[in-house]
Amino acid sequence: MDPAPGVLDPRAAPPALLGTPQAEVLEDVLREQFGPLPQLAAVCRLKRLPSGGYSSTENLQLVLERRRVANAKERERIKNLNRGFARLKALVPFLPQSRKPSKVDILKGATEYIQVLSDLLEGAKDSKKQDPDEQSYSNNSSESHTSSARQLSRNITQHISCAFGLKNEEEGPWADGGSGEPAHACRHSVMSTTEIISPTRSLDRFPEVELLSHRLPQV
């Protein structure tokens, strides 16, 4: 009885195995079918031939070498740019801590920081324009005032950063390294700026404090 159509007969001899064909390269196959292929080259100046085709007017190897040199210069430029932003990031206190700051964040923070420092310098210049009584008082207590001003200057950056951390408190931990320090400790640090001022001297003698209170966000 013959097997049903489409069913292999187990008694039949196995079919002969076909050998693996040689590896074909598409470029070779296309060249055999269509003739010479267009030459791949880097961007360069081309000259139109009378036949209608185009031919390069430059040495291909020189074009590729110039391209490699240009790419190396661009990579070095990007590295220098990233190193510059990294140094600027380490100096600017106005940066979000809940996420990685972008280059735009770093530039905005640097702009705000420069503006605050500029306001402090302007306030220091205005403080020198005092009436004779105030000038006499300043001369009599210059040593204590200088010490207080230096202490205030050392704490400005810390207090600015702390105040901005309170503003974005809901976004995550700030520059305290994730220690979970309560927010009221940061507020106490900001308010302690006025504690370095001599009790016999009014707060308006230190325009830096007033300027700082206007520039910082309300917490």
Curated annotation (Swiss-Prot):
Germ cells. Expressed in the fetal ovary, but not by a range of other tissues. Expression increases across mid-gestation, rising some 40-fold by the time of primordial follicle formation. PANTHER family: BASIC HELIX-LOOP-HELIX TRANSCRIPTION FACTOR, TWIST, FACTOR IN THE GERMLINE ALPHA. One of its GO terms (biological process) is developmental process. Its main location: nucleus. Residues 65-117 form the bHLH domain. Keywords: Developmental protein, Differentiation, DNA-binding, Nucleus, Oogenesis, Premature ovarian failure, Transcription, Transcription regulation. It is linked to Premature ovarian failure 6: An ovarian disorder defined as the cessation of ovarian function under the age of 40 years. It is characterized by oligomenorrhea or amenorrhea, in the presence of elevated levels of serum gonadotropins and low estradiol. InterPro entries: bHLH_dom, E-box_TF_Regulators, HLH_DNA-bd_sf. Germline specific transcription factor implicated in postnatal oocyte-specific gene expression. Plays a key regulatory role in the expression of multiple oocyte-specific genes, including those that initiate folliculogenesis and those that encode the zona pellucida (ZP1, ZP2 and ZP3) required for fertilization and early embryonic survival. Essential for oocytes to survive and form primordial follicles. The persistence of FIGLA in adult females suggests that it may regulate additional pathways that are essential for normal ovarian development. This is Factor in the germline alpha. It is found in: Nucleus. GO terms for molecular function: bHLH transcription factor binding; DNA-binding transcription activator activity, RNA polymerase II-specific; DNA-binding transcription factor activity, RNA polymerase II-specific; protein dimerization activity; RNA polymerase II cis-regulatory region sequence-specific DNA binding; RNA polymerase II transcription regulatory region sequence-specific DNA binding; sequence-specific double-stranded DNA binding. Residues 124-151 are annotated as: Disordered.
